[in-house]
Amino acid sequence: MKQLFAFPLTYQSRKHEKHVAQYAHDLIMRENRLIPMHDLNSAIQLSTDYAKALDQFDLSMYFRLAYAAPFLSRRALWIASSNEHIKDLDHHLASIRTCAVYIAEQDFKQATRSITKNVYFTDIAVHNMQFPFEFDNSYTTAYKNALQTLTTIMYSPAETVFLPLKCFPFCNILMRGYSRETSLCMSPNALFELNQTVYATDFLSMTAFDFQQAVFRSNYDLLKLCGDVESNPGPTTWSSLSVEAITLCAPIKIPSDDEVKSLLPTLFSSDKVYNIFKEYDIIDPSDSVQTMTLFNTLRSKGEAFSKLSEQFSLTDVLNTANRFKVSEKLVMSIAFGMNIVVIDHENNQAYLTRTCNTDQTLFLLISKEIGSDSVSVPFVGEDGDHLRYVSRVTLTSEISHALFPGEALKPVDGSTFFESPTLDVFYEMSYDYGIDELVQLLIPNKYDISMIRSKLDVPRTPWSRFDVLNRKNPTYPPRPQPYGMGPMNGEQAKEYAKASIRIFNTACPEHKIAIPVIYTDDEIVSSNKSSRYYYPTSHAGTSIINHKQCVTDNKQLAPLFGSTPKKLFSKYVSQTNGVFLLMRVYVRELDNDVFDSGVIYVTLHVGNDGIGTHIILTTSYLERIGQSMLVNHVYKIRRADGKYDFQFLEVEGLVSDDEKHRDMLQEICSENDDVIKALYQQINKTEREISRQIGNVLKEHDSVNGRAIMKRADFRLVMHETDEVRSKQISVSVHRFKVLQIPVFTHIVTVKSEIEYGIPLFVRDALIPRIKRRLTSTKQEQHLSSDEAYEINASYRTGCKAVMSLLVEGDLVRLPCGMITTVDNPILHKHSCTLGLHALTGSATGPKKLRIHSAFKCSKCHKVYNNNILAQRCVRAHLGI
């Protein structure tokens, strides 16, 4: 969990704060610092490196105390004092056996005298610490521990002071990298004043220590030198924020003891309730449970929680998913250290309980049908005993995003399912931008917790990280690329895509819109032109589409996504054994010739039932439809749990520079030939013959080069009843942040590929008027065919580079830039990596010459242009016309 906190720059010393924090950030973000501190050795090394960074500045004692104090918080003390972690310290002990510390002391006459103390660090219980450290992660506790250590050194009656070995990282920073002779530079009077601030109700009320306190708070979450380093580096507020590198979550207020007591009546229900906590004797309802007692009890009941992997005890037959009460789901989520999603198949609803700021999520499906890994769940209802089945399901990231837009949910791995982590509860003070004040945070396990409302009745925080980003650092997308200006460079495209995602993910209402399926142009003419319509690529589709309707839809989203370099929201997968499939849809607005392109997600689980569909739409101009036919996806086949599935090797959209030059197809060659053949043989022979006529879903394995290629495809859902094949419409209704209504399929579901390469006639016809208007303004030719009109768009040419050779296999083409498409793609020759290339290939309709040779050139100077208009202008310039 990475959190963003302000750096309060106060008083004259603020000039150091920015640079010191930058050094701390760079230190933690080094490659060798990405592993959290796990023993005393790493703590000592980390403190040494950090002390060297601080030595570059002329810092006061207050500064060094602020930066060193985190090493005396709970996590650091536990790591440094655990017997199993104190090992291999001979090389450290040899250098820290003794150290001369010079202390400046003033008497009542203001006379200064120096005292020399020899400090020893040892793991033997002979040290001079009179009181044990308090174990807490709050600012107050770490500050007390730091002052306690200083008091022991300064007020020890003997010249030799023995300190616990766990104090060494703190002293290492405080005493300038721990040279053998160091000056503590602090008078007893100053130490006394520091101790007084511990008990002050307002830490900032004392001017003398204002900045020291502020430094500690501002860097406490940045440093996290006390344990969970790699998950808490925090960004620097003075530089631009990276959406990819930071996740902001709202802090929460810890429930009081009274609030916890008020949960008990709901946590332990009436005698008819089959309660999970009562059943496994986790908590006695008769006990008076305080806040810390509740979580400490849960921590000690790991064995009881493991039994939940075998049985869930539910109540209330009328509402399956709600049998888990809000308080139960809250405690379960905290105890498991993960989010809980309950999919109620019986009532077509899904619920998300998010308490831990982690993407690890447990997906539970409750259904009447038994699955391969289902757990039978008995419960008591008003009309008798009932039996339901609870299954752990694994959803793809696309489907989980469709169920809960804006949420990052990652299914827990099967090997760690229901492994209850140790529940350690920590407290610390942190700054909340939402309320502009310090709040106390509750941190179970290694995660922070997001906001929990007082009634604990909401699935997520009411405001998102984008609200915080916009408040602290407003970011506006660059202007959409002007027509005819060529492609964006890599950095522009990256910033543009990030800004586009930020705007699109902003919370806004969603509407359920009924959209009739239109098959012919006659139906378009006779229909109501004010409506939205669904143009299927085959004769099977959905009649209801969930459309994201923003207030600025026409003014902002349309141009934004119409000029996005690559589509950002689409992934295509089909697993032919009926696990899941995705379908591409286009929705056209007749009045403004704008398409909404989207993906429909259909999830198939538990017998023959499908448990979820969803459509995500983004606005796109008509010319972008052809661009979507370029595939940047390559899939690898793997065997898992006795089944075959596909694994993404690269996703569509903007990728890193390293991934751009990665030949994904070479990785497929390393797969077992038998695995690829076995998967391909699962496709029904009849379906395979149909697929070969209209486009394959999976290209047949080639024993020569060992490659299997998956093509982009549109799919239709087909229901089988005996030998009859009929279409089945899908109905879906989604309410953002509320309950998802999930459709139920009652027939055997199979997948048929319905691929139409090339541009539909209605798309080309719609292009002609717009193209003609543009040409009229430039006094170019007035009459264009559909093909010619489609080819003049200058924005199609991409700035890709040839990194591999051209590969043609059947009607499939791997372009030199690594993308995969077919020979029928109308914008194939627009890729700059194809300039000057020629190839012949065979397709379903016979031999065909690739169109990639048809780049536009000036006939005089032979310079290549993005479109014919620019090429003709160059010719006229040579001729002086």
Curated annotation (Swiss-Prot):
Q: What is this protein called?
A: Non-structural protein 1
* Domain of life of the native organism: Viruses
